[in-house]
Amino acid sequence: MTQYTLKQAGSLLQSKQISAVELASAYLAAIAEKNPALNGYITIDQDKTLAEARAADERIAQGNASALTGVPVAYKDIFCQTGWRSACASKMLDNFIFPYTATVVQNLLDEGMVTLGRTNMDEFAMGSTNENSFYGAAKNPWNPEHVPGGSSGGSAAVVAARLAPAALGSDTGGSIRQPASHCGITGIKPTYGTVSRFGMVAYASSFDQAGPMAQTAEDCAILLNAMAGFDPKDSTSFEREKEDYTRDLDKPLKGVKIGLPKEYFSEGNSTDVQTALQNTIDLLKAQGAELVEVSLPQTKLSIPAYYVLASAEAGTNLSRYDGVRYGHRAAQFGDLEEMYGKTRAEGFGSEVKRRIMIGTYVLSHGYYDAYYLKAQKLRRLVADDFQTAFARCDLILAPTAPSAAPKIGADTSPVETYLSDIYTIAVNLAGLPALTLPAGFSGGGLPVGVQLVGNYFAEAKILGAAHQIQLNSDWHGKRPE
């Protein structure tokens, strides 16, 4: 029962071939069996889940259901929900129960979806491997010696392991797309401002964006229909007419122009990634898409620009965690200043501390112009590059990561880890939508994904192209043993 896609589960629930309680119980049983080894979930509340499932069954019986009523969903530990712990995988918020619900979570609750739990992540969404979690690293379900990616690694892992039909993630510099690639699932980062950030704990506010993660592009489109929309509680939310993100799913690829950035098809990609790209190019050609070369010359500068800007915003956003009103507080201190220092030293992990220090440094007197202001100018140049490219094409095909998932505990420096986001970060700098879909496997049997990037608010076009690729391939249908 846990092998269904989100769409299949919804159809079976609506036709009353299965009940929401039966489906939720099947997932809870699978989680109890597999999660201790996977560590994909860090919070489960069986009573709350089954209560939501019973309410969904009542709604279906009354004929008042949506296509998503009764379908289970997992939430990254960064999304608030009344009565649920959301710790952002940090000691700082360990056992903190939020008194309110994120808008995007409420949207799915209004549809009647059933909460399965909170998924593991890099602390405060800062990381690319899911090793920066206070609750221990999540494992890649294809090979537990490897990382699932990050920061939404737990969400990717539970969907790939069929411990949830879908999950929510957040993407600040690739945190939906990179773990989706490493775990062999589909995930989309929408245009910045498409999905409300209210109730999603902030890392870097001008980058953060929530998005769906599921087995297929069709599932992501269905979920995004429920997630997206204007929210007056979020000052960065776009006020636009409601869209149907499934509208292009049946549109053929014939005549669609696909841009291939010459900077992204480099010697730095592993053979596995090159093969995955060629697999996708062959599929696109076979369906009549036109391939054109484009250039994104500022890509090489996107990583330093991103880490200056995101760290500056993180340093500001995380200043609220001081032990005064909520969260961890040091047990022993002499005065208020010592309490602040000890609380933050004890509550934050090493990667979070590193980024806070970088952010404080680049915003300090004498360095603001040299780093922060220059990074903002680079951000504009990156966005301009994409607009130049989209004048020649409809969508851009690119790698998601330079290689398949690395091993847990791999001896890599922070800078080497940051470089693994080389192909995802530019999209966040520009605020564009992008989707990762499975496109092959490494020699070691690990999934490899590619990404499709579109212009602003082109989510339906991206999802349609991805769906057409998936209709003619089966990588998305593979699952770990």
UniProtKB/Swiss-Prot annotation:
One Gene Ontology molecular-function label: ATP binding
SUPFAM superfamilies hit by this protein: Amidase signature (AS) enzymes
A GO cellular-component term linked to this record: glutamyl-tRNA(Gln) amidotransferase complex
One GO term (biological process): translation
Enzyme Commission number(s) from the entry: 6.3.5.7
Entry-linked Pfam families: Amidase
InterPro entries to which the protein is assigned, alphabetical: Amidase (IPR000120), Amidase_CS (IPR020556), Amidase_dom (IPR023631), AS_sf (IPR036928), GatA (IPR004412)
Alphabetically ordered keywords of this record: ATP-binding, Ligase, Nucleotide-binding, Protein biosynthesis
Active site: 76, 151, 175
Domain of life: Bacteria
Reactions mediated catalytically: L-glutamyl-tRNA(Gln) + L-glutamine + ATP + H2O = L-glutaminyl-tRNA(Gln) + L-glutamate + ADP + phosphate + H(+)
HAMAP family: GatA
Quaternary structure, from the entry: Heterotrimer of A, B and C subunits.
Function text: Allows the formation of correctly charged Gln-tRNA(Gln) through the transamidation of misacylated Glu-tRNA(Gln) in organisms which lack glutaminyl-tRNA synthetase. The reaction takes place in the presence of glutamine and ATP through an activated gamma-phospho-Glu-tRNA(Gln).
Protein family per UniProt: Belongs to the amidase family. GatA subfamily.
Name of protein: Glutamyl-tRNA(Gln) amidotransferase subunit A
Organism: Neisseria gonorrhoeae (strain ATCC 700825 / FA 1090)
Organism placement in taxonomy: Bacteria, Pseudomonadati, Pseudomonadota, Betaproteobacteria, Neisseriales
Gene that this polypeptide is encoded by: gatA
